[in-house]
């Protein structure tokens, strides 16, 4: 039985309507001047009162026009919101279980199932729980109606019979009270009938036996998606509640661009704390890779090349040149190292090589006279511009201005000639004058011990923060010494420093 509201709502004057638009900060909420004649509720507009009146009359003027859908609504907004459920596209996704929804409010209601601190409403009579207060109130109204109470627990309206009250409760549940649904759609393989075509398609798995829905936790298969969902909630509830907390792996840009293998000798040094790294004199570290392998020609294509980089504290690290992009091979004419350069000598420089070998043979017989000659000899070590002719091929090995400016502070009385020979391998093989592809050098074991004994003191001076000269300056000086050996005009000057 529908109850008619006394008075016609269309007769309400337009001047009594609440002003539309957003309220300003200082304004108060609009007064609810439009009370309902059947209940105690009041509204601030005629439209809202009219929509509310449909809950008493059971009228639903806005009907869905989709095929096989008999739903109707009290407002145009609710009809438009419902029409989104007929769309095949689901735009709202749950971040916990990746379930998709047509409407945002459906997703919001679904998120309550993942909230560990969610507020649930539990019925004391049957123990059923509800996430929303409205659903809980509808459930309590059903209990009250079956017990004989003729008052609606949702809107507090009284009815004359239990049947009328139950029919009224459907309006609060969003269901139409007019007409009885018919099962219009029949299965082709059996006599069962269903309300919608979707129910028929879901029923078809009984006849086909297909099980397309696989459980990702136990590999059990199901023919219907709702059966899989029920299985997941029942058997794998803990796995569903776990949130994916694994961060995205951000790759190191250095390791992405170049794969640099570090030698085993550097691993104990790199594992030291930073305080010990700055205070400890690296007597052994300076000797790392001093005599790696016999120097090979950069023109040899069959062998793997190695490039030795100089770390900030004077440590050297070999880099496999095959791991670098091939375009980088053009940028390095000779490998960077604390030792002498691996130089491919052209044919026109072969006479110069004989002079270098004869000089090195004379160098083995004698030792530096004293450390007093170091300032004078350091000025003759090729720190002056080379006077070689451009036809000598020494242009590729000429000393740059930057290396000259760095090596100038090293011309101090505290500098010994033994420091200039830190590029000579201490424990290398004996000098072989017949070796063609290398510039190997050697000297007596006594000179090696004297050089090693003097290395720690000089290393501590170089590690001093007040000293502006780093170990890289020694490397550049070694390069200057090597480049000075390549010119025939500077060899006699360097030889006179030891006489």
From Swiss-Prot:
<feature type="zinc finger region" description="C2H2-type 3">
    <location>
        <begin position="92"/>
        <end position="114"/>
    </location>
</feature>
<dbReference type="GO" id="GO:0000978">
    <property type="term" value="F:RNA polymerase II cis-regulatory region sequence-specific DNA binding"/>
</dbReference>
<feature type="region of interest" description="Decreased nuclear import with localization in the nucleus but also in the cytoplasm">
    <location>
        <begin position="41"/>
        <end position="242"/>
    </location>
</feature>
<keyword id="KW-0539">Nucleus</keyword>
<feature type="zinc finger region" description="C2H2-type 7">
    <location>
        <begin position="213"/>
        <end position="236"/>
    </location>
</feature>
<keyword id="KW-0863">Zinc-finger</keyword>
<keyword id="KW-0862">Zinc</keyword>
<protein>
    <recommendedName>
        <fullName>Zinc finger protein PLAG1</fullName>
    </recommendedName>
</protein>
<keyword id="KW-0677">Repeat</keyword>
<feature type="region of interest" description="Repression domain; contains 3 sumoylation motifs and massively decrease transcription activity">
    <location>
        <begin position="243"/>
        <end position="383"/>
    </location>
</feature>
<dbReference type="GO" id="GO:0035264">
    <property type="term" value="P:multicellular organism growth"/>
</dbReference>
<dbReference type="InterPro" id="IPR036236">
    <property type="entry name" value="Znf_C2H2_sf"/>
</dbReference>
<dbReference type="GO" id="GO:0010628">
    <property type="term" value="P:positive regulation of gene expression"/>
</dbReference>
<dbReference type="GO" id="GO:0008270">
    <property type="term" value="F:zinc ion binding"/>
</dbReference>
<feature type="cross-link" description="Glycyl lysine isopeptide (Lys-Gly) (interchain with G-Cter in SUMO)">
    <location>
        <position position="244"/>
    </location>
</feature>
<dbReference type="GO" id="GO:0016607">
    <property type="term" value="C:nuclear speck"/>
</dbReference>
<dbReference type="GO" id="GO:0060252">
    <property type="term" value="P:positive regulation of glial cell proliferation"/>
</dbReference>
<dbReference type="GO" id="GO:0005813">
    <property type="term" value="C:centrosome"/>
</dbReference>
<keyword id="KW-0010">Activator</keyword>
<keyword id="KW-0238">DNA-binding</keyword>
<dbReference type="GO" id="GO:0001228">
    <property type="term" value="F:DNA-binding transcription activator activity, RNA polymerase II-specific"/>
</dbReference>
<feature type="region of interest" description="Disordered">
    <location>
        <begin position="365"/>
        <end position="400"/>
    </location>
</feature>
<keyword id="KW-0656">Proto-oncogene</keyword>
<comment type="function">
    <text>Transcription factor whose activation results in up-regulation of target genes, such as IGFII, leading to uncontrolled cell proliferation: when overexpressed in cultured cells, higher proliferation rate and transformation are observed. Other target genes such as CRLF1, CRABP2, CRIP2, PIGF are strongly induced in cells with PLAG1 induction. Proto-oncogene whose ectopic expression can trigger the development of pleomorphic adenomas of the salivary gland and lipoblastomas. Cooperates with CBFB-MYH11.</text>
</comment>
<feature type="zinc finger region" description="C2H2-type 2">
    <location>
        <begin position="62"/>
        <end position="86"/>
    </location>
</feature>
<dbReference type="InterPro" id="IPR050331">
    <property type="entry name" value="Zinc_finger"/>
</dbReference>
<dbReference type="GO" id="GO:0022612">
    <property type="term" value="P:gland morphogenesis"/>
</dbReference>
<dbReference type="InterPro" id="IPR013087">
    <property type="entry name" value="Znf_C2H2_type"/>
</dbReference>
<dbReference type="GO" id="GO:0010629">
    <property type="term" value="P:negative regulation of gene expression"/>
</dbReference>
<feature type="short sequence motif" description="Nuclear localization signal">
    <location>
        <begin position="22"/>
        <end position="25"/>
    </location>
</feature>
<dbReference type="GO" id="GO:0060736">
    <property type="term" value="P:prostate gland growth"/>
</dbReference>
<feature type="region of interest" description="Massively activates transcription">
    <location>
        <begin position="384"/>
        <end position="499"/>
    </location>
</feature>
<keyword id="KW-0832">Ubl conjugation</keyword>
<feature type="zinc finger region" description="C2H2-type 6">
    <location>
        <begin position="185"/>
        <end position="207"/>
    </location>
</feature>
<comment type="subunit">
    <text>Interacts with KPNA2, which escorts protein to the nucleus via interaction with nuclear localization signal. Interacts with E3 SUMO-protein ligase PIAS1, PIAS2 and PIAS4.</text>
</comment>
<comment type="similarity">
    <text>Belongs to the krueppel C2H2-type zinc-finger protein family.</text>
</comment>
<keyword id="KW-0804">Transcription</keyword>
<dbReference type="Pfam" id="PF13894">
    <property type="entry name" value="zf-C2H2_4"/>
</dbReference>
<feature type="zinc finger region" description="C2H2-type 5">
    <location>
        <begin position="150"/>
        <end position="172"/>
    </location>
</feature>
<keyword id="KW-0805">Transcription regulation</keyword>
<dbReference type="GO" id="GO:0005829">
    <property type="term" value="C:cytosol"/>
</dbReference>
<dbReference type="GO" id="GO:0035265">
    <property type="term" value="P:organ growth"/>
</dbReference>
């Amino acid at each position: 039985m529908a109850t008619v509201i006394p008075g016609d709502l269309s007769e309400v004057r337009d001047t009594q309507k609440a002003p539309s638009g957003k309220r300003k900060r200082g304004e108060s909420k609009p007064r609810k001047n439009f009370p309902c004649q059947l209940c105690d509720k009041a509204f601030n507009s005629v439209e809202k009162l009219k929509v509310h009146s449909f809950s008493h009359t059971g009228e639903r003027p806005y009907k869905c026009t989709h095929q096989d859908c008999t739903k109707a609504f009290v407002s145009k907004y609710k009809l438009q919101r419902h029409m989104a459920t007929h769309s095949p596209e689901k735009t709202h996704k749950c971040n916990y279980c990746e379930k998709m929804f047509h409407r945002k409010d459906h997703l919001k209601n679904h998120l309550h199932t993942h909230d560990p601190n969610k507020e649930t409403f539990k019925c004391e009579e049957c123990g059923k729980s509800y996430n929303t207060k409205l659903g809980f109130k509808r459930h309590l109204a059903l209990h009250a109606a079956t017990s004989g109470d003729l008052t609606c627990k949702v809107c507090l309206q009284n009815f004359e019979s239990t049947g009328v009250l139950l029919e009224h409760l459907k309006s609060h549940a969003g269901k139409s009270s007019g007409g009885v649904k018919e099962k219009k759609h029949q299965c082709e393989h059996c006599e069962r009938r269903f309300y919608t075509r979707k129910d028929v398609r879901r029923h078809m798995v009984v006849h086909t036996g297909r099980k397309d829905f696989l459980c990702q936790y136990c590999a059990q298969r199901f023919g219907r998606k709702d059966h899989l969902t029920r299985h997941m909630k029942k058997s794998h509830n803990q796995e569903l509640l776990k949130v994916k907390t694994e961060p995205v792996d951000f790759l190191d840009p250095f390791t992405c661009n170049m794969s640099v293998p570090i030698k085993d000798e550097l691993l104990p040094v790199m594992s030291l704390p930073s305080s010990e790294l700055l205070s400890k004199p690296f007597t052994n570290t300076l000797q790392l890779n001093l005599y790696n392998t016999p120097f090979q020609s950069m023109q040899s294509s069959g062998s793997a090349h190695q490039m030795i980089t100089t770390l900030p504290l004077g440590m050297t690290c070999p880099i496999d040149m095959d791991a670098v992009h091939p375009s980088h091979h053009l940028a390095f004419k000779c490998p960077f190292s604390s030792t002498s350069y691996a130089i491919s000598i052209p044919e026109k420089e072969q006479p110069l090589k004989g002079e270098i070998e004869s000089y090195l043979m004379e160098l083995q017989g004698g030792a530096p006279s004293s450390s007093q000659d170091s300032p004078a000899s350091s000025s003759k070590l090729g720190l002056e511009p080379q006077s070689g002719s451009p036809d000598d091929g020494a242009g590729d090995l000429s000393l740059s201005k930057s290396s000259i400016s760095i090596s100038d502070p090293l011309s101090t009385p505290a500098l010994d000639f033994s420091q200039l020979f830190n590029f000579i391998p201490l424990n290398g093989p004996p000098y072989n004058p017949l070796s063609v592809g290398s510039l190997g050098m050697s000297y007596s074991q006594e000179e090696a011990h004297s050089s090693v004994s003097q290395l720690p003191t000089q290393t501590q001076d170089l590690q001093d923060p007040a000293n502006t000269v780093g170990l890289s300056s020694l490397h550049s000086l070694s390069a200057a010494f090597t480049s000075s050996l390549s010119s025939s005009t500077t060899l006699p000057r360097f030889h006179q420093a030891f006489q």
